[in-house]
Swiss-Prot record:
One of its GO terms (cellular component) is cytosol. SMART domains: AICARFT_IMPCHas (SM00798), MGS (SM00851). The keyword Methyltransferase does not apply. InterPro entries: AICAR_Tfase_dup_dom_sf (IPR024051), Cytidine_deaminase-like (IPR016193), MGS-like_dom (IPR011607), MGS-like_dom_sf (IPR036914), PurH-like (IPR002695). GO terms for biological process: 'de novo' IMP biosynthetic process. This is Bifunctional purine biosynthesis protein PurH. The lineage of its organism: Bacteria, Bacillati, Bacillota, Bacilli, Lactobacillales. CDD domains: IMPCH (cd01421). Keywords: Hydrolase, Multifunctional enzyme, Purine biosynthesis, Transferase. PANTHER family: BIFUNCTIONAL PURINE BIOSYNTHESIS PROTEIN ATIC, BIFUNCTIONAL PURINE BIOSYNTHESIS PROTEIN PURH. The keyword Hydrolase applies. It comes from Streptococcus mutans serotype c (strain ATCC 700610 / UA159). GO terms for molecular function: IMP cyclohydrolase activity; phosphoribosylaminoimidazolecarboxamide formyltransferase activity.
Amino acid sequence: MTKRALISVSDKSGIVDFAQELKNLGWEIVSTGGTKVALDKAGIDTIAIDDVTGFPEMMDGRVKTLHPNIHGGLLARRDLDSHVNAMKEHEITPIDLVVVNLYPFKETILKPDATYADAVENIDIGGPSMLRSAAKNHASVTVVVDPADYAEILDELSANGETSFETRKRLAAKVFRHTAAYDALIAEYFTAQVGEEKPEKLTLTYDLKQPMRYGENPQQNADFYQKALPTAYSIASAQQLNGKELSFNNIRDADAAIRVIRDFKDRPTVVALKHMNPCGIGQADDIETAWDYAYEADLVSIFGGIVVLNREVDAATAEKMHAIFLEIIIAPSYTDEALAILTTKKKNLRILQLPFDAQEASEAEKEYTGVVGGLLVQNQDVVKESPADWQVVTKRQPTKTEETALEFAWKAIKYVKSNGIIVTNDHMTLGVGPGQTNRVASVRIAIDQAKDRLDGAVLASDAFFPFADNVEEIAAAGIKAIIQPGGSVRDQESIDMADKYGIAMVFTGVRHFRH
């Protein structure tokens, strides 16, 4: 019996050659709409879909393949006499191969001028139905959704006259992933359209971007996936200009670094980061000086770190960065001379380019944190804060210079792992105390790191001080201004301690835990 293929594709790459090879192998081809036009134009004889269904394509193509003569030919089990007899009774011809890809819903909604009506019209109905029918009956039907699979299928058909069950099963799995992702993207779009904040079902669509050698440790398998609707300002969208491929830990650190620098939009800023904690942040009127400050913040920890800059990298800054070992440099752009300097004798240095003009869109994204058996979802910590809303709770008011330093410190502390403490002046970090299980230990680490640079320094805490001993440690170091959320039942004890030592203390009313 002559084998029958049904071909209906929106992506016509490679389809003419594939169909011609099928014809050469003796297959007959049923086709639809634009696909039939393309194949006919190439001189490939095809059967029109309406000759199979007995109905014309109608309603602007919305109804063309939803018919028993199509789905009966796809779903009929060849090993069941009742199914075979039903096909004979109703004059249904079995379909052995389905080649379908779907309306370009994703491509449509990514267009800047796409309307809601455009999106709706590009929701494919018949295509997923055929794919799912064929995939369900993969014991008998080969189903293809990806042009990359054409060559393998032709090789098997040429060698054996049919595809193997293993191949059909693998292709069926690919189809179910494809249709599930397609529907999930539609669901995501409609959820956003109606403004649903807490959907009872959560579907997320990601595409494999990079298979990884290993994960956080060599014994862990890992891969990197990118959102099906890419976020412009994200590590997943960064363009790599030089160096080895990014590792699992590189990606996490780079993601953390570009989150930090989002809060420093107004002035040239450089962030150095290690193990997802900032180890140096510098801000100045030019990017070279900002680099100097970030580097001087912690000369040791920056070694082998991640550096992100929010202005174009010039030759002078590149020369300084080239002088030390860095894992990754991220910037919106590089001068030709700077790029030449950074890549000289450093073929492994990962250099990434990331446009900084889409930061607000990235801030609107949800954060997803996996736990065993579940997923936590939250908004990002991007609350808009104004110093005008802060409260000075001590007798002593901060000086103008201290006010500037406190604003800088408060931006930086958001990205230090809790319990987080940071010591800064008005243009650079001086000491970072991250991730301790008691806050006073973080205070001691940050102060010890700042050492002899404490004159005029201020201190920020990501959450309230539970006891006044924190303030006592700070006072002993000579720091004269503190910024923290407040909110402890013992706030007054901390205020009294600050007053005792002539320290200005500001309450923001906003906590910035980071786990």
